[in-house]
Amino acid sequence: MAQFDTEYQRLEASYSDSPPGEEDLLVHVAEGSKSPWHHIENLDLFFSRVYNLHQKNGFTCMLIGEIFELMQFLFVVAFTTFLVSCVDYDILFANKMVNHSLHPTEPVKVTLPDAFLPAQVCSARIQENGSLITILVIAGVFWIHRLIKFIYNICCYWEIHSFYLHALRIPMSALPYCTWQEVQARIVQTQKEHQICIHKRELTELDIYHRILRFQNYMVALVNKSLLPLRFRLPGLGEAVFFTRGLKYNFELILFWGPGSLFLNEWSLKAEYKRGGQRLELAQRLSNRILWIGIANFLLCPLILIWQILYAFFSYAEVLKREPGALGARCWSLYGRCYLRHFNELEHELQSRLNRGYKPASKYMNCFLSPLLTLLAKNGAFFAGSILAVLIALTIYDEDVLAVEHVLTTVTLLGVTVTVCRSFIPDQHMVFCPEQLLRVILAHIHYMPDHWQGNAHRSQTRDEFAQLFQYKAVFILEELLSPIVTPLILIFCLRPRALEIIDFFRNFTVEVVGVGDTCSFAQMDVRQHGHPQWLSAGQTEASVYQQAEDGKTELSLMHFAITNPGWQPPRESTAFLGFLKEQVQRDGAAASLAQGGLLPENALFTSIQSLQSESEPLSLIANVVAGSSCRGPPLPRDLQGSRHRAEVASALRSFSPLQPGQAPTGRAHSTMTGSGVDARTASSGSSVWEGQLQSLVLSEYASTEMSLHALYMHQLHKQQAQAEPERHLWHRRESDESGESAPDEGGEGARAPQSIPRSASYPCAAPRPGAPETTALHGGFQRRYGGITDPGTVPRAPSHFSRLPLGGWAEDGQSASRHPEPVPEEGSEDELPPQVHKV
């Protein structure tokens, strides 16, 4: 524990989420006028249940689904016990003859009930098996616990059912066809009538998201800052990512809601974690707790492993029989879902994005099939298919062939072999275009490391993308190994990071009026957590430690503003969005001039545009990606970025969401959700009673607008990164047992950091050519918005970039030691101000 020595920058609150004068507001309502939903104490749980009931399509569907989950667990346990103790496999495999007639020479047809043991024999065999009795007792206790929890949840969800009917005035029959934005708008309106939260007069969309996603935002931030041990370097296999549902459950149990966790309740961090005086003691306490939970996982490993195997067998056996190539399909990994998730992004919003990116991601991964593997698969399919064809022909000629021993088994195995081999044979009409596919993927998933662009054809890019988009078989294998690996990760990998986790929660927690303690990254404040290379130059005061990696703050802000057009961002965020809108207008105008004069019209590009319906917003993405490679003559690489950016900006200018009451035809004036007011605001933000069909169409336009902005912002980021004189490598310092400090970067004998490019936050320190247009962009941003401050904001001293929080940062040519100045320990706690600040 002596090596737990890190330096964290103090985080100041940047703006007030409440109107002026409401910071200490407590709304008083007369006793007789209170509604059943006045002053709900646990709004986190309440809003989460409101959201879950909406996603489960109403109370009836949720009730039936919960009942079937209970029955499913009971079925797995009972059916497994029956197979182990109540079946005579000698009769089933014809090793023992059964004769029901009086004449032994007569042939007898064996039926399935003949293989079942009598009830008395079955009961006796169960009672004689002590290990089986132990497993059944544990399973019974767990099932009773789930039953009690089910009854409690049903009572709570019945209250949510009444809230939908009477407060929101949404019948259960109409709920499956209502978008979440409609439900959320009615919740905001209900706050004015019933005062659900008494600490604020009005609720905002961000308040509701903070309540529902409080812990999820912390998890996204922990993954973004590489504090959780998810990446491992395996001998002979290289770098691998291991993140399963069981491991995630243990992380949440330790940090958020388990006994002895960091949080006092759903909305408040414990007071001792808000000060730095007891950080070492708290880290030791957290380390011990992680150790005990790891030991508990180790003791329960056999039971959990048995359950994982049985559940996987019963879940995927039928799928394999019906579709043998299903395990060759791919899915988004759990790490990928957490890495690609925006701050303040609900589960259905994330799932919608990933679903749109699934097909191009599958096509991209299919571009890298091994030629040798393809050759082996073709010949394997030929030999297995030939034998299978002969057996099928013989069966058609005489069905008695199936009565021959192992013929049916052989036919089944040969069919599976042919199906698996065909999955490794590429489509003969497939065109190898990885760069275009990667741009389409980026338009939907919104996050991508810098070094992937221009290197989409390389195997390294494919391997790194496979960590986000893995085989279904790999996903199942990781879940089966999770009971064994999880205790090892907790004990040997998570415990050394206890102090860094304690410091993270102290320094990145803010108290929002009417919401409680939230992750400061979830505020999406470009001044506190913006990155200069993501259009935040001149607006951010964050040190390199406080910056969110991969443009998470900027992209999350843009996504939330587009998804919730009625939301009014704070001043700095409004300035950021407004400046981006102006930049889009300038680049779009330049692209229009270039198309008219400098760039000749391309026939293929024109044909693609004519084939795409203008009423479909997704056609814009296809036009942008196709136009990047089809329009005009080939350009040098340094000029391709400008052309790509101009094309995306032109698409954004021509992109027009629907006006109220307008059919989805044609294009109109460009709109962008920069300040929270645009064409969609009048239809989806201000009116609660708009049509369901129009809401769905507007949602499609919003997702397409965000896809175009993701492409545009990544292109701007790429040009800004090239304009930097040098870029800095940031990596998390692994805890070592030696305790030796790293040499100064500017000192003699300094070593260059290990170059492992992974994302936008892992650039190599190398000089880059400047870009005059990006420098002008920075200067214009500083002139236009650099002087904006909030009234009442405490001025902050400039951050000292020479310090190395978490080990590994050094800027401006300054040297820094690995171990910074220590934080005062116990006894000086009164001298430290609280580390949680009201917002």
UniProtKB/Swiss-Prot annotation:
Biased segments, Basic and acidic residues type: 724-736
InterPro entries: Autophagy-rel_prot_9 (IPR007241)
N-acetylalanine: residues carrying this PTM: 2
Free-text description of this protein's post-translational modifications in UniProt: Ufmylated in a DDRGK1 dependent manner.
Record topological domains on the Lumenal side: 85-128, 398-406
Cytoplasmic side: 2-61, 155-290, 302-319, 329-371, 425-470, 481-483, 493-839
Record bears the keyword Transmembrane: yes
Broad class of where this protein is predominantly found: membrane
Top-level division of the source organism's lineage: Eukaryota
Reaction catalysis annotation: a 1,2-diacyl-sn-glycero-3-phosphocholine(in) = a 1,2-diacyl-sn-glycero-3-phosphocholine(out); a 1,2-diacyl-sn-glycero-3-phospho-L-serine(in) = a 1,2-diacyl-sn-glycero-3-phospho-L-serine(out); a 1,2-diacyl-sn-glycero-3-phosphoethanolamine(in) = a 1,2-diacyl-sn-glycero-3-phosphoethanolamine(out)
Biological process per Gene Ontology, one example term: reticulophagy
Cellular component GO terms, alphabetical: autophagosome membrane; endoplasmic reticulum membrane; Golgi apparatus; Golgi membrane; late endosome membrane; mitochondrial membrane; mitochondrion; phagophore assembly site membrane
Its membrane topology: Multi-pass membrane protein
Membrane-spanning residues: 62-84, 129-154, 372-397, 407-424
Glycan attachment positions: 99
Motif stretch (Tyrosine-based sorting signal): 8-11
Methyltransferase in keyword set: no
Modified residues (Phosphoserine): 14, 16, 18, 656, 735, 738, 741, 828
Keywords: Acetylation, Autophagy, Cytoplasmic vesicle, Endoplasmic reticulum, Endosome, Glycoprotein, Golgi apparatus, Lipid transport, Membrane, Mitochondrion, Phosphoprotein, Transmembrane, Transmembrane helix, Transport, Ubl conjugation
Cellular compartments annotated: Preautophagosomal structure membrane; Cytoplasmic vesicle, Autophagosome membrane; Golgi apparatus, trans-Golgi network membrane; Late endosome membrane
Intramembrane stretches: 291-301, 320-328, 471-480, 484-492
Chain positions covered by the region annotation Disordered: 1-20, 656-686, 719-839
Function: Phospholipid scramblase involved in autophagy by mediating autophagosomal membrane expansion. Cycles between the preautophagosomal structure/phagophore assembly site (PAS) and the cytoplasmic vesicle pool and supplies membrane for the growing autophagosome. Lipid scramblase activity plays a key role in preautophagosomal structure/phagophore assembly by distributing the phospholipids that arrive through ATG2 (ATG2A or ATG2B) from the cytoplasmic to the luminal leaflet of the bilayer, thereby driving autophagosomal membrane expansion.
Summary of subunit composition and partner proteins: Homotrimer; forms a homotrimer with a central pore that forms a path between the two membrane leaflets. Interacts (via cytoplasmic its C-terminus) with ATG2A. Interacts with SUPT20H. Interacts (via the tyrosine-based sorting signal motif) with AP4M1; promoting association with the AP-4 complex. Interacts with ARFIP1 and ARFIP2. Interacts with PI4K2A and PI4KB. Interacts with ATG4A; the interaction is direct and promotes ATG9A trafficking.
Classification via PANTHER family: APG9 AUTOPHAGY 9, AUTOPHAGY-RELATED PROTEIN 9A
Name of the protein in its database record: Autophagy-related protein 9A
Gene source species: Pongo abelii
The gene coding this protein: ATG9A
